[in-house]
Amino acid sequence: MYLTNYILFCCFNAKNIGYFFGNYLIKKEVLFKRIVNFVLRNNSRIFSAKSVYDYILNEGYTCSINTVMNFINYLKEAFLIEEIKQYSTKVKRELSYFGKLYDMDVSSNSIRADRNRFDIEHNLENIVFNELIYKGYKVQLYNLNGYEIDFRCEKKSKIIFVQVAYSVVNESTYNREMKPFSLLDNSNEKILITTDKVDYSTSTVRHIELEKFLLQEDI
């Protein structure tokens, strides 16, 4: 957390910006700031370097996809973001071309919110991701027949599947979050994490309130 805040300070404080750019030999400072803001503001979303590249072109800047990838790698090296890949059931490996980016400090998104329009859903997913990493899990995206499960989590021989939602009080939201679970067998635990106080556990899915999840040593 302290390293993240320090890097943010160096990146965006006018008096210290030279330190960060000097270490990474970045010459296109304005372009770098644009990419940083875009990436940190779009956490917990499907990511590709091409999508960032297209955004930059649309903003009127010119650069190469390699430049975008290099800048994103700098953010990873500075522990500002973490990238996870999709787990493939067919080839039993990660799909290197498909993934999401998560902010190591979720406030990196909030301080960039437009007119205080905080992105609660994606930030909540980001918070759960950070906590799963802290609890020692290897975390991957999971897709089964076109239905996305937020996280496939593995630690030693333990595998769990996790869905995250702000609330499932609405029936359509509940059905959307639970549908992917119904396509899995029951050999591994399935967990739904929300802010709801009501217990939505079923015979095959365990519901955990967010606050309790954050206070647990493990799941």
Where are these regions (language model features)?
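Accessory nucleic acid-recognition modules appended to NTPase machines
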Residues: 4-156
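Nucleic-acid nuclease catalytic cores
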Residues: 144, 185-204
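Short active-site-adjacent structural elements
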Residues: 149-150, 170-173, 199-202
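Hydrophobic/aromatic beta-strand patches that form the interior of the parallel beta-sheet core
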Residues: 102, 162, 191-193, 206-208
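Domain-level recognition of nuclease-like catalytic cores that cleave nucleotide substrates
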Residues: 197-219
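Active-site ExK catalytic segment of metal-dependent nucleases
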Residues: 158-170, 177
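Hydrophobic, well-ordered secondary-structure elements that form the walls
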Residues: 132, 162, 181, 190
